[in-house]
Curated annotation (Swiss-Prot):
Protein's name according to its UniProt entry: V-type ATP synthase alpha chain
HAMAP family to which the protein is assigned, alphabetical: ATP_synth_A_arch
Enzyme class name: translocase
Catalytic reactions on record: ATP + H2O + 4 H(+)(in) = ADP + phosphate + 5 H(+)(out)
Regions crossing the membrane: none
Listed InterPro entries: ATP-synt_VA_C, ATP-synth_a_Xtn, ATP_synth_asu-like_sf, ATPase_a/bsu_AS, ATPase_F1/V1/A1_a/bsu_N, ATPase_F1/V1/A1_a/bsu_N_sf, ATPase_F1/V1/A1_a/bsu_nucl-bd, ATPase_F1/V1_b/a_C
Pfam families: ATP-synt_ab (PF00006), ATP-synt_ab_N (PF02874), ATP-synt_ab_Xtn (PF16886), ATP-synt_VA_C (PF22919)
GO molecular function: ATP binding; proton-transporting ATP synthase activity, rotational mechanism; proton-transporting ATPase activity, rotational mechanism
EC nos: 7.1.2.2
CDD domains linked to this entry: ATP-synt_V_A-type_alpha_C, ATP-synt_V_A-type_alpha_N, V_A-ATPase_A
Purpose: Produces ATP from ADP in the presence of a proton gradient across the membrane. The V-type alpha chain is a catalytic subunit.
Record family assignment: Belongs to the ATPase alpha/beta chains family.
């Protein structure tokens, strides 16, 4: 690591430090500030004066202390050993920090991101004389039940002079050498602010299934898409993201707790190790990386944490896997940008946020996508970002900037959350731009009439919402029977289809075949009941029909029993309203 001439601290304003005499320093270089060697990053240069955001508490730092540049950008180490890891915002493992400094993170502490002593069983997939590209696969390492592919750095490639034999190696051992003398290890470094290069971005065509009916049916997300979950405090953003992390169909989960309360991250750290992965039967943590950057940690590290998370996600994407990144919450990240911007005395824009807020958000969300990697594999990163608008005001700058970038908008409703309706996603205020893209997949893999059924359900819910306003004004007795049927069907759809019980082992997650079966049941009920009304039945007779209870219980039926249960309910629906006359 080349060391340049030291500069000195000129002024300190919270996490922002101005250093003079920084000859040879570059933008985004990592620096060590003060005698305690606090980690910082240069975010602006003016001649030999550097503006540094410090990722640790600057209390006690004084003017005149040394500032030393490392000539390296903020980078993460990518290799075996990251899965099941819990890091802070700049990829320092929290368990190692605790061993070194106790319950609180000591300032200036330096710990290795990956275990440098553990030996990994490396199996090469290339031979001397082969040509490898950047992000090319050199071999594999088993990590838990996961096959970790060892990649060349994206900016390195060429003909291989030597490849290590199959055996056990640490991440510092050389496992291959290029003809130009470049030595390749099991791990490599990559700067977090630079997107990892790919051959090309692909048109998304597969759904990212979450296990939540309201999302998978009404507002789907594509594999490689970006979604926003805005909502006021207490509406369930964190719980919704945790549920998607548990039951989503991604191969790898990266969960970034960015500026949220420490108790919420504690819940994740306690719950996730106990969760069983439905794919492997092992712990879910074995395919999860957690980045904990809570609200009481230094503000500047929040800004870095989302870049750290997306870089880890891109690394697994380059191995040909699908990755989901949960960012909770991007509002806290934007607040960190605002604080740093104000410390640097930049001109503020709306609500004090910097004018480049939209560009920064776009630079983050646009690193999502389905791609063809440099080595020819298909991979994807799906980003789901929570937004916490103050007081639930959706017109504030972070929400509006996020809306312009993301393709799915899952609006959380405090009223639904208070009524214990989970997930508390407002079906009349949410949307997905990916629905037309996925219609073909749904027709081929779920049901040929799936898009039409979804449209009918959407129409019924909208009609029910309009009729509820009438009911609140004049009462239900003023409605005709067919309108009361719409209200009853809407209630059933809300309570027995869109709502899920997160504590129930069966209902916490639902497959698409089961969702399709439920959709057909509820619409069959509406069609048969509507026909019965036309034949002279009354709405009271229909509401008291015992088949409604069976429809309500359908979502709690296990997947392996659902087909038979659904068939029985459909048969009963065909006969139960026949011959019922007024």
């Amino acid at each position: 690591m080349t060391q340049n001439k030291q500069g000195v601290v000129q002024s300190i304003a919270g996490p922002a430090v101005i250093a003079d005499g920084m000859y040879g320093a570059k933008m985004y270089d990592i620096v060590r500030v003060g005698r305690e060697r606090l980690v910082g990053e240069i975010i602006r240069l003016d001649g030999n004066t550097a503006f540094v955001q410090v990722y640790e508490d600057t209390s006690g730092l004084t003017v005149g202390e040394p500032v030393e540049t490392t000539n390296l950008p903020l980078s993460v180490e990518l290799g075996p050993g990251m899965l099941n890891g819990i890091y802070d915002g700049i990829q320092r493992p929290l368990d190692k920090i605790r061993e070194a400094s106790g319950d609180f993170i000591a300032r200036g502490i330096e710990v290795s991101s990956l275990d440098r002593t553990k030996k990994w069983a490396f199996t090469p997939s290339v031979q001397p004389g082969d040509t490898v590209v950047g992000s090319g696969i050199l071999g594999t390492v088993p990590e838990f039940s996961f096959t970790h592919k060892i990649l060349t750095p994206p900016d390195k490639g060429g003909k291989l002079r030597w490849v290590a034999a199959a055996g056990e190696y640490t991440i510092d051992d050389t496992i291959a050498e290029l003809e130009d003398g470049t030595k390749l290890r099991l791990a490599h470094y990559w700067p977090v602010r630079a997107p990892r290069p790919v051959q090309k971005k692909l048109d998304p065509s597969l759904p990212f299934l979450t296990g939540m009916r309201i999302l998978d049916v009404l507002f789907p997300l594509v594999m490689g898409g970006a979604a926003a979950i805005p909502g006021p405090f207490g509406s369930g953003k964190t719980v919704t993201q945790q549920s998607v992390a548990k039951y989503g169909n991604a191969d790898i989960v990266v969960y970034v707790g960015c500026g949220e309360r420490g108790n919420e991250m504690t819940d994740v750290l306690v719950e996730f190790p106990e969760l069983v992965d439905p794919k492997t039967g092992g712990p879910l943590m074995h395919r999860t990386i957690l980045i904990a950057n809570t609200s009481n940690m230094p503000v500047a590290a929040r800004e870095a944490s989302v870049y750290t998370g997306i870089t880890l996600a891109e690394y697994f994407r380059d191995q040909g896997y699908s990755v989901s990144l949960m960012a909770d919450s991007t509002s806290r990240w934007a607040e960190a940008l605002r604080e740093i911007s104000s410390r640097l005395e930049e001109m503020p824009a709306e609500e004090g946020y910097p004018p480049y807020l939209g560009a920064k958000l776009a630079a983050f969300y646009e690193r999502a996508g389905a791609v063809k990697t440099l080595s020819g594999d298909d991979g994807a990163v799906s980003v789901i970002g929570a937004v916490s608008p103050a007081g639930g005001d959706m017109s504030e700058p972070v929400t509006q900037a996020t809306l312009r970038i993301t393709g799915a908008f899952w609006r959380l409703d405090a009223g639904l959350a208070r009524r214990r309706h989970f997930p508390a996603i407002n079906w009349n205020g949410s949307y997905s731009l990916f629905t037309p893209i996925l219609d073909k997949w749904y027709r081929q893999n779920v049901g040929p009439d799936f898009p039409e059924l979804r449209q009918r359900i959407t129409n019924l819910l909208q009609q029910e919402a309009a009729l509820q306003e009438v009911v609140q004004l004049v009462g239900p007795d003023a409605l005709q029977d067919n309108e009361r049927l719409i209200i009853e069907t809407g209630r059933m759809l809300r309570q027995d289809f869109l709502q899920q019980n997160g504590f129930d082992p069966v209902d916490a997650s639902a497959s698409m075949p089961k969702n399709y079966g439920l959709m057909k049941m509820f619409l069959k009920f509406y069609d048969e009941a509507d026909l019965a009304l036309k034949n002279g039945s009354t709405i009271d007779e229909i509401i008291q029909n015992p088949v409604i209870e069976k429809l309500a219980r359908a979502r709690y039926t296990p997947e392996n029993e659902f087909a038979a249960y659904g068939e029985g309910v459909m048969d009963q629906l065909s006969t139960t309203f026949k011959g019922v006359k007024a």
